[in-house]
Structures are given as C-alpha cells and as structure tokens.
Amino acid sequence: MLGKSQFDDLFEKMSRKVAGHTSRRGFIGRVGTAVAGVALVPLLPVDRRGRVSRANAAESAGDPRGKWKPQDNDVQSCDYWRHCSIDGNICDCSGGSLTSCPPGTKLASSSWVASCYNPTDKQSYLISYRDCCGANVSGRCACLNTEGELPVYRPEFGNDIIWCFGAEDDAMTYHCTISPIVGKAS
C-alpha cells in the first residue's frame, strides 16, 4: 500500500503530466462544447408513434379518461377524434365549424398543437387548436380533453392557456376553439 507521501507524489506527477500536455484553452473549449451539446439535446427529434398505442390501450378503472375512445361520427361530441386535446368549447356548437369561427368572433393568431388519432383511417394527425375570441363563452359543448397535454413549460402543447392575446381588434374574450388538421403526424 502506498503511503501518504507516495500517493501525493504520484498524484502530483500525474497532474503535472496532464497539465504539460493540455492547454487551458483546449480544456475550456471542450467544456464549452459539452455544455452546448447538452443544451441542444431537447431540440433533437423524438419518435412518439408509440404514445398512440399506449394512450389507446390505457384502461384505468379510477380514471374516467382511461375509457375514452375517439370516434369519427359526431363532430359536436367531446370524443370526436380531432378533440383529443381540446380544453374549451367546440365552435361547431356555436355556429362555426371545425375550421372556422362563428360569426361575430375573431380568430386568434396563436395556437397550440396536438397529435390526434383518427380511428377511421388509423392515422395520427397534427391538429392546430386555435381560439375564437371576441364574444362571451357559449357554454355549449364544453370539453376537457387532455390526450398528449404537456405541462405549461411547453406552452405550444398546453391547452390550459387562453390564446386570445393574439386576436384582432383586442378581442380578448374567449368564445370557442376550432381544430383544423395541419397534416399527418406519423
């Protein structure tokens, strides 16, 4: 076993050897590269196709949402497949449609997105939820669906935010939400 002084001598010799063969700038550059690389990890693409099968397979007795099955018949129903992540009122019940606001309301320029599964063609689609603003809440067809919802620190996937701050003419009062298809998600 090495004594204390032998250990100190060995460590000092190795430290001096490493210091003699490397520069401070090189070390700082490598640390900077590592920090930048770690910061860029959240920007990498992620394959979430497995989430659809897990979401549809979830059958929880304590969770009423566990039995939620998307359907493709009644667009004014909360379980219509495009409404998988809607948190608000469906515009189709207020004189609008899946893609247009009711008369007297303005379309907000901001949106949030979700990937919803269509049971008819067994495909997932990217839905861009946009709020219609400028009239009082209709109260008809109110839905609280949270399929694929993420916490508020990812606001582009957050359905708890009222997105009327981008509407024309300062129409800040929420009325309903439309759900147009952006494209295929998978």
From Swiss-Prot:
Any one GO cellular component localisation term in the record: outer membrane-bounded periplasmic space
Covalent cross-link (Tryptophan tryptophylquinone (Trp-Trp)), residues: 112-163
GO process terms (BP): amine metabolic process
Annotated cofactor note: Uses a protein-derived tryptophan tryptophylquinone (TTQ) cofactor.
Disulfide bonds, paired cysteine numbers: 78-143, 84-116, 91-176, 93-141, 101-132, 133-164
Signal peptide: 1-57
SUPFAM superfamilies: Methylamine dehydrogenase, L chain
Residue positions where Tryptophylquinone is found in the record: 112
Main localization of the protein described in the UniProt heading: periplasm
Protein family per UniProt: Belongs to the aromatic amine dehydrogenase light chain family.
Task of the protein: Methylamine dehydrogenase carries out the oxidation of methylamine. Electrons are passed from methylamine dehydrogenase to amicyanin.
The protein, known as: Methylamine dehydrogenase light chain
Organism: Methylorubrum extorquens (strain ATCC 14718 / DSM 1338 / JCM 2805 / NCIMB 9133 / AM1)
Gene symbol of the encoding locus: mauA
